[in-house]
């Protein structure tokens, strides 16, 4: 084999090894997904004690103890959530029902299905499901999920 042929073979082999090493170092590709509130595979769990009876949460993506978790929050028809706040900002879309939200010092928000709402971090708020059907709210949290009551002991 000529020195040119040997050099070419070594370069191709080196590139293949570098490519294989880079691929092995890359994190696993996340899978795309879709979810609906009626998905039977959703695992609904209880809400924190502050929330009303019948409230349920389903984690859609991520880990609620870490940044960037997404969840569905389900409130029974007529249920109200007392004043509380979150360390994280919330980005929300109402999926079902009609919901009123009251953020301290701001005009009342009324959400219908498909409407987006933004809740600033640490801003106290309350909410009520004002429809005759349960309210389902998609929430994207920027940081770990928490619910802090504004009244101590709640």
Feature names for model-found ranges:
Residues 105-122:
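Short acidic-glycine-tyrosine-enriched beta hairpin
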Residues 1-12:
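Bacterial N-terminal signal peptides that target proteins for export
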Residues 69-86, 120-122:
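Conserved short histidine dyad/triad with adjacent acidic residue
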Residues 11-20:
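Bacterial N-terminal signal peptides
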Residues 22-69, 152-154:
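A short, N-terminal "cap"/entry segment at the start of jelly-roll beta-barrel domains
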Residues 33-36, 126-154:
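Double-stranded beta-helix
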Residues 76-79, 86-105:
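Glycine- and acidic-residue-biased ligand/ion/polar-headgroup-sensing regions
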Residues 81-83, 101-102, 119, 124-130:
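Short beta-strand His + acidic residue motifs that chelate non-heme Fe in jelly-roll/DSBH
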């Amino acid at each position: 084999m000529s020195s040119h042929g040997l050099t070419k073979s070594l370069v191709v082999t080196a590139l293949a090894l570098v490519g294989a090493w880079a691929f092995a170092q890359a994190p696993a590709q996340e899978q795309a997904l879709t979810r609906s509130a009626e998905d039977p595979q959703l695992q609904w769990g209880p809400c924190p004690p502050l929330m009303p009876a019948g409230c349920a949460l389903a984690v859609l993506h991520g880990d609620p103890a870490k940044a960037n978790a997404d969840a569905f929050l389900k409130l029974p028809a007529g249920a109200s959530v007392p004043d509380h706040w979150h360390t994280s900002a919330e980005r929300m879309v109402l999926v079902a029902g009609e919901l009123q939200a009251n953020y301290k010092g701001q005009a009342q928000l009324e959400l219908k299905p498909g409407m987006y709402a933004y809740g600033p971090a640490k801003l106290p708020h309350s909410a009520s499901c004002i429809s005759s059907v349960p309210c389902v709210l998609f929430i994207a949290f920027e940081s770990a999920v928490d619910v802090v009551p504004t009244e101590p002991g709640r």
